[in-house]
Amino acid sequence: MEQDGDQLSARPALETEGLRFLHVTVGSLLATYGWYIVFCCILLYVVFQKLSTRLRALRQRHLDGAAAALEPDVVVKRQEALAAARLKMQEELNAQVEKHKEKLRQLEEEKRRQKIERWDSVQEGRSYRGDARKRQEEDSPGPSTSSVIPKRKSDKKPLRGGGYNPLSGEGGGACSWRPGRRGPSSGGUG
């Protein structure tokens, strides 16, 4: 019986010794490599999350492909819908191209007509710019809010005389200024 009591008392001592050893080993390991272990765990978690979502998507595509292979009607309907959408988009694009071509053709026709009118007016001896103004006035009869009324220039007096130039010495002013000579001054060295 004594032997059994010694074994029982010896066993807890061994267990406590093992726990101390484990505590010291794990504590020193965490003290030296603790942050590395934490960062590695976080990195593994993130990588696992990314791979699991990709794996799920890959499985889903595989299952969809298998289901589509089993149901050819679904594939045919999908292809028909795709072809119809492409055809509709092409028709819209063709309509836009036709509208653009029509606009360009109208602009070219207008330019050609204006050139012919200018040529005719030049051949007759008229100014084509004056004719263009008259045509504009004829095209928009009545008062226009956006048009600017030209001011009369004859009512205003000119601010200066016609030939006044302060740098040349001509015109109004009692003194006349002339620029100096560019050469060396006379009477100097040289």
Curated annotation (Swiss-Prot):
<dbReference type="GO" id="GO:0051117">
    <property type="term" value="F:ATPase binding"/>
</dbReference>
<dbReference type="InterPro" id="IPR009703">
    <property type="entry name" value="Selenoprotein_S"/>
</dbReference>
<dbReference type="GO" id="GO:0016209">
    <property type="term" value="F:antioxidant activity"/>
</dbReference>
<dbReference type="GO" id="GO:0030970">
    <property type="term" value="P:retrograde protein transport, ER to cytosol"/>
</dbReference>
<dbReference type="GO" id="GO:0005881">
    <property type="term" value="C:cytoplasmic microtubule"/>
</dbReference>
<comment type="subunit">
    <text>Interacts with DERL1 and (via VIM motif) with VCP, suggesting that it forms a membrane complex with DERL1 that serves as a receptor for VCP. Also interacts with DERL2, DERL3 and SELENOK. The SELENOK-SELENOS complex interacts with VCP.</text>
</comment>
<dbReference type="GO" id="GO:0034362">
    <property type="term" value="C:low-density lipoprotein particle"/>
</dbReference>
<keyword id="KW-0597">Phosphoprotein</keyword>
<keyword id="KW-0832">Ubl conjugation</keyword>
<feature type="transmembrane region" description="Helical">
    <location>
        <begin position="28"/>
        <end position="48"/>
    </location>
</feature>
<dbReference type="GO" id="GO:0045454">
    <property type="term" value="P:cell redox homeostasis"/>
</dbReference>
<dbReference type="GO" id="GO:0002865">
    <property type="term" value="P:negative regulation of acute inflammatory response to antigenic stimulus"/>
</dbReference>
<keyword id="KW-0472">Membrane</keyword>
<keyword id="KW-0812">Transmembrane</keyword>
<feature type="region of interest" description="Disordered">
    <location>
        <begin position="115"/>
        <end position="190"/>
    </location>
</feature>
<dbReference type="GO" id="GO:0051775">
    <property type="term" value="P:response to redox state"/>
</dbReference>
<keyword id="KW-0256">Endoplasmic reticulum</keyword>
<dbReference type="GO" id="GO:0009749">
    <property type="term" value="P:response to glucose"/>
</dbReference>
<keyword id="KW-0963">Cytoplasm</keyword>
<dbReference type="GO" id="GO:0080164">
    <property type="term" value="P:regulation of nitric oxide metabolic process"/>
</dbReference>
<keyword id="KW-1133">Transmembrane helix</keyword>
<dbReference type="GO" id="GO:2000110">
    <property type="term" value="P:negative regulation of macrophage apoptotic process"/>
</dbReference>
<feature type="modified residue" description="Phosphoserine">
    <location>
        <position position="140"/>
    </location>
</feature>
<dbReference type="GO" id="GO:0030968">
    <property type="term" value="P:endoplasmic reticulum unfolded protein response"/>
</dbReference>
<comment type="function">
    <text>Involved in the degradation process of misfolded endoplasmic reticulum (ER) luminal proteins. Participates in the transfer of misfolded proteins from the ER to the cytosol, where they are destroyed by the proteasome in a ubiquitin-dependent manner. Probably acts by serving as a linker between DERL1, which mediates the retrotranslocation of misfolded proteins into the cytosol, and the ATPase complex VCP, which mediates the translocation and ubiquitination.</text>
</comment>
<dbReference type="GO" id="GO:0036513">
    <property type="term" value="C:Derlin-1 retrotranslocation complex"/>
</dbReference>
<dbReference type="GO" id="GO:1990381">
    <property type="term" value="F:ubiquitin-specific protease binding"/>
</dbReference>
<keyword id="KW-0712">Selenocysteine</keyword>
<protein>
    <recommendedName>
        <fullName>Selenoprotein S</fullName>
    </recommendedName>
</protein>
<dbReference type="GO" id="GO:0071222">
    <property type="term" value="P:cellular response to lipopolysaccharide"/>
</dbReference>
<dbReference type="GO" id="GO:0036502">
    <property type="term" value="C:Derlin-1-VIMP complex"/>
</dbReference>
<comment type="similarity">
    <text>Belongs to the selenoprotein S family.</text>
</comment>
<dbReference type="GO" id="GO:1902236">
    <property type="term" value="P:negative regulation of endoplasmic reticulum stress-induced intrinsic apoptotic signaling pathway"/>
</dbReference>
<feature type="compositionally biased region" description="Basic and acidic residues">
    <location>
        <begin position="115"/>
        <end position="138"/>
    </location>
</feature>
<dbReference type="Pfam" id="PF06936">
    <property type="entry name" value="Selenoprotein_S"/>
</dbReference>
<dbReference type="GO" id="GO:0034599">
    <property type="term" value="P:cellular response to oxidative stress"/>
</dbReference>
<dbReference type="GO" id="GO:0034361">
    <property type="term" value="C:very-low-density lipoprotein particle"/>
</dbReference>
<feature type="compositionally biased region" description="Gly residues">
    <location>
        <begin position="160"/>
        <end position="174"/>
    </location>
</feature>
<feature type="region of interest" description="VCP/p97-interacting motif (VIM)">
    <location>
        <begin position="78"/>
        <end position="90"/>
    </location>
</feature>
<dbReference type="GO" id="GO:0006983">
    <property type="term" value="P:ER overload response"/>
</dbReference>
